[in-house]
Design a protein with these regions (language model features):
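Short, charged, amphipathic alpha-helices and their helix-cap/turn boundaries
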Residues: 135-140, 181-182, 216-255, 280-298
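N-terminal leader/targeting segments and the immediately adjacent pre-domain N-terminus
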Residues: 22-145, 202, 206, 247, ...
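Active-site SXXK
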Residues: 134, 152-177, 200, 269-273, ...
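Active-site-proximal alpha-helical segments within enzyme catalytic domains
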Residues: 203, 264-272, 313-334, 393-409
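Short active-site loop at a secondary-structure junction
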Residues: 118-129, 142-173, 177-191, 195, ...
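Lipid interaction determinants
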Residues: 439-549
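Active-site helix/loop module of the DD-peptidase/beta-lactamase fold
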Residues: 147, 170-212, 248-250, 264, ...
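Active-site Gly/Thr loop motif
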Residues: 296-299, 350-404
Length: 549
């Protein structure tokens, strides 16, 4: 399958299409043959000369060396840690689902089916973990990766940067309508000077910046050398940091008209986050998320010569911790009963962006998709959205199925278009399977309330319920958040117990709706899910509540 220019843009700065990666006319070594251990990379004291990998090698990030490098960035370049704090790692309950490797699906554009296990190998997967209702139903490793190994996340990093950006917007610390040049005077004369924060977040800026890795004169090479992700050539006199590189990028047209996937947007956003909070990106992520979700290991960012974290592609993480991050987002920023991130930030990401600017960008394999806050939204019936990085890095979140899929990989080709045909249908196949096998249909996603005791609901009031696997009930009662517990049994029996609610006043009509809802919930005795997927809650007196995911 040929790569279009649009597809080539879906790459991280350390891509290798111009550095000796195999052409698509060639058949790269299989995942087994290219395993770092089978190849003998960096084995021995010292390793043989022809098995040594150095940062100064022009092909250190080319396949098949790539398969070793993705787990060893910390040995090759400067980094900054994302502190996990002193606490214990949070539990990931195990509930293995047999038969997932045998699931079959048809790749995009194909005719013959393939199995999930075959796709694992075809995509040169290093690790893949699936959470359903917060429980691990599938976990498998290969290549350089193990349960405690850190792996480069590539452009998946951008989505973490975007998440933190949306958090600051939701909290009022960062004005999404402000001009970047006003917030960062050093960027006033650059392409970003008159761009809004929102345009940077959604990558609807127009930059004179090429990420065509087949072009040796593309601006991406200088940006990579400025950020120290590639060794500069002899006599290099260009920018020496991300900050310097961003100031040299010029405007290519009117902002806000078309989606244009350009890594400098993420680096500009990283600068905005640091300027707003007074903290570098690695410290901000540690403070807001990493120390609070029970991460197993310190994560890290690669950094430039002055210590600036690479906001567009430098994050390194374990597979399990990546899955924990996905579960936090699936749970609307709530973790073990504590709201770590404003739910409004997650909801804005989950809604996706405008489809028209995305459609004009030419992603033929992603019809109906959109992009918001550096997250990719599928536009499908489940509202699935994802963080994506080249060589196969993925964090796929399906709110309806209550599924998180985390994958770290070292695919030979540095473009998502190369693995999407065997990845996107695989994600949908496993979510369909898990939903079909689900013995706890109440769990998963938000049940958005459509009617309370026959009185309907006021439009756009965001009343919803979430039934969590540990027995907790969380939701929004119209004006206020609620929490409690749920217990279900045979023949649709259900008991709900409320244990807390916030006490914010709002308009009388909204308060009246909330009062009706809060009066009904403790009286619920049973439930059913009808053929349309609607949830019905019943009281002994015959009153009902209906909701839909």
């Amino acid at each position: 399958m040929g790569l279009t220019v649009a597809c080539l843009r879906i790459v991280v700065l350390v891509s290798t299409l111009a550095l000796g990666a195999p052409s698509q006319a060639q058949s790269p070594p299989s995942t087994q043959a290219s395993d770092p251990r089978a190849m003998g990379w960096m084995q021995g004291f010292p390793p043989p000369a022809d098995k040594t990998i150095r940062f100064t090698d022009p092909d250190y990030f080319s396949f098949p060396k790539l398969r070793w490098t993705v787990c060893h960035f910390r040995e090759l370049m400067p980094t900054a840690g994302v502190d996990r704090g002193p606490g214990a790692a949070s539990a990931l309950p195990q509930a293995p689902e047999p038969g997932i490797d045998a699931l079959r699906f048809t790749p995009l554009g194909g005719q013959a089916s393939m199995s999930w296990g075959e796709a694992f190998d075809a995509n040169h997967t290093d690790g893949l973990l699936v959470l359903h209702h917060g429980r691990v139903v599938y976990e498998r490793y290969a290549g350089c990766l193990g349960p405690h190994t850190l792996h480069g996340a590539m452009s998946l990093t951008k989505s973490i940067t975007g998440l933190l950006g949306e958090v600051l917007v939701a909290e009022g610390a960062l004005d999404e309508n402000a001009r970047v040049g006003t917030l960062i005077p050093q960027l006033q004369d650059s392409a970003f000077g008159d761009a809004s924060v929102r345009q940077v977040l959604d990558m609807t800026t127009t930059l004179q910046f090429s990420e065509d890795y087949a072009d040796p004169n593309a601006e991406v090479w200088q940006h990579a050398q400025a950020g120290s992700t590639l060794p500069p050539p002899a006599g290099y006199t260009g920018p020496r940091s991300y900050y310097e590189s961003l100031q040299q990028i010029r405007k290519g047209g009117e902002h806000g008209q078309v989606f244009g996937y350009k890594t400098p947007n993420a680096d500009a956003l990283g600068w905005l986050l640091a300027r707003t909070t007074g903290k570098p990106l690695n410290e901000l992520l540690a403070e807001r998320i990493w120390r609070r979700i029970g991460a197993e290991r310190e994560a890290f960012y690669t950094v430039d010569a002055i210590g600036t974290p690479f906001a567009g592609g430098g994050f390194n993480v374990t597979l399990r911790d990546l899955a924990r991050l996905g579960q936090l987002i699936l749970q609307q920023g709530e973790w073990q009963g504590v709201q770590l991130l404003p739910s409004a930030a997650i909801e804005r990401i989950q809604r996706g962006g405008e489809r028209a600017p995305f459609a004009r960008a030419g992603y033929a394999q992603l019809p109906g998709w959109s992009y918001r806050a550096m997250w990719w939204h599928s536009g499908d019936a489940h509202g699935a959205f994802s963080a994506r990085g080249v060589h196969g890095q993925t964090l796929w979140i399906d709110p309806v199925a209550d599924v998180v899929i985390a994958r770290l990989a070292s695919h030979p080709v540095a473009a998502n278009a190369a693995n999407d045909p065997t990845s996107l249908p695989a994600w949908r196949a496993v979510t369909k399977h898990l939903m079909a096998q689900d013995q706890t249909p109440l769990l998963g996603g938000q049940w958005v309330i459509e009617d309370v005791a026959g009185a309907g609901v006021i439009d756009r009031t965001r009343a919803f319920l979430r039934f969590l696997a540990d027995g907790r009930l969380v939701g929004h009662a119209t004006c206020n958040g609620l929490r409690g517990h749920h217990t279900s049994g045979a023949r649709g029996r259900l008991r709900l117990r409320l244990t807390g609610i916030t006490r914010k006043r709002c308009a009388p009509a909204l308060m009246h709706q909330e009062e009706r809802l809060l009066a009904l919930l403790p009286r619920v005795t049973r439930y059913r899910i009808d053929d349309s997927g609607a949830l019905w809650l019943y009281t002994a007196a015959g009153k009902t509540l209906t909701a839909r995911r």
